[in-house]
């Protein structure tokens, strides 16, 4: 299955100093032949976060965009348009979303389901049951690193 990479996974891949860089790189290396995907939301989020002065290893937005564009040129990359709406009746089981912080995760999971792929994230507690048609195979939560990178 093609893997839609969450913003946090894209950041970990692009920032060699990120505490989850090794875990993200290792996972993608093992699954690259299945393909990976990004979408406007994940691309924008990656550029926004990595270019913020408050981010420890920040860089200018143009530099981050160039690096992300280079990664997206890889033959295994798929670009998924924002083809789903959370407002489509039945797409989201709203009572299963306990907090607003899960809305973006639910959207990206729904996009993965729509594209017959899987959503790969570092986030714990992604509400699988909140997305119509989502099954365990549609979600991969990477194990977080337990040590700080230097």
Write out the residue ranges for each language-model feature.
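Proline-centered loop/turn at the N-terminus of a beta-strand
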Residues: 2, 35-37, 78, 118, ...
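Acidic, PIN/NYN-like endoribonuclease modules and their adjacent C-terminal/linker elements
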Residues: 85-98, 109-150
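Acidic catalytic patch
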Residues: 16, 37-44, 66-97
């Amino acid at each position: 299955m093609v893997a839609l990479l969450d913003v946090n996974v894209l950041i970990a891949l692009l920032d060699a100093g990120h505490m989850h860089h090794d875990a993200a790189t290792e996972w993608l290396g093992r699954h690259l032949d299945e393909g990976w995907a990004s979408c406007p939301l994940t691309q924008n989020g990656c550029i926004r976060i990595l270019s913020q002065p408050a981010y420890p290893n920040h860089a200018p937005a143009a530099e981050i965009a160039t690096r992300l564009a280079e990664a997206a040129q890889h033959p295994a990359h798929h670009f998924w348009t924002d083809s789903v709406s959370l407002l489509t009746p039945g797409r989201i089981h709203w009572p299963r979303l306990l907090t607003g912080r899960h809305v973006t995760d639910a959207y990206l999971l729904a996009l993965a389901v729509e594209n017959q792929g899987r959503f790969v994230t570092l986030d714990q507690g992604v509400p699988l049951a909140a997305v119509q048609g989502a099954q365990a195979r549609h979600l991969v939560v990477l194990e977080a690193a337990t040590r700080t990178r230097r």
